[in-house]
Amino acid sequence: MGLRYSREVKQRYGEKELEGRIPITLDMPQTLYGRYNCKSCWFANKGLIKCSNHYLCLKCLTAMLSRSDYCGICGGILPKKLVFETTPSAPPYTP
């Protein structure tokens, strides 16, 4: 789940990587000035999505997308398509 595209998507686009996907980070590294946090709620530091110049958690991103297509903090367009940078931990896929 999450590693494979549906049959329709494969037939439409082939095996090439889909464009316009924003990476979702499972674990952000700690920086010189502290940990990365969600700019909206300031609590979440895992599962962050990069908006134009800041990060948002999935909960805040969903809340902002329910109101508008634009970010309430920076005014940029909110990301709608996500892709995992690292594969979530799961048993290996065996057909």
From Swiss-Prot:
GO terms for biological process: viral budding from plasma membrane; viral budding via host ESCRT complex. One of its GO terms (molecular function) is zinc ion binding. It is a lipid-anchor. InterPro entries: RING_finger_Z_arenaviridae, Z_RING-type_Znf_sf, Z_RING_Znf. A zinc finger (RING-type) spans 38-74. GO terms for cellular component: host cell perinuclear region of cytoplasm; host cell plasma membrane; membrane; virion component. The keyword Zinc-finger applies. It comes from the Viruses. A motif (PTAP/PSAP motif) lies at residues 88-91. Myristoylation is required for the role of RING finger protein Z in assembly and budding. Transmembrane segments: none annotated. Keywords: Host cell membrane, Host cytoplasm, Host membrane, Host-virus interaction, Lipoprotein, Membrane, Metal-binding, Myristate, Viral budding, Viral budding via the host ESCRT complexes, Viral release from host cell, Virion, Zinc, Zinc-finger. It is found in: Virion; Host cytoplasm, Host perinuclear region; Host cell membrane. A lipid is attached at residue 2 (N-myristoyl glycine). Plays a crucial role in virion assembly and budding. Expressed late in the virus life cycle, it acts as an inhibitor of viral transcription and RNA synthesis by interacting with the viral polymerase L. Presumably recruits the NP encapsidated genome to cellular membranes at budding sites via direct interaction with NP. Plays critical roles in the final steps of viral release by interacting with host TSG101, a member of the vacuolar protein-sorting pathway and using other cellular host proteins involved in vesicle formation pathway. HAMAP family: ARENA_Z. Belongs to the arenaviridae Z protein family. Interacts with protein NP; this interaction probably directs the encapsidated genome to budding sites. Interacts (via RING domain) with polymerase L; this interaction inhibits viral transcription and replication, Z partially blocks the product exit tunnel for the releasing nascent RNA product. Interacts with the glycoprotein complex; this interaction plays a role in virion budding. Interacts with host eIF4E; this interaction results in eIF4E reduced affinity for its substrate, the 5'-m7 G cap structure. Late-budding domains (L domains) are short sequence motifs essential for viral particle budding. They recruit proteins of the host ESCRT machinery (Endosomal Sorting Complex Required for Transport) or ESCRT-associated proteins. This is RING finger protein Z. It comes from Bear Canyon mammarenavirus (isolate Mouse/United States/AV A0070039/2000).
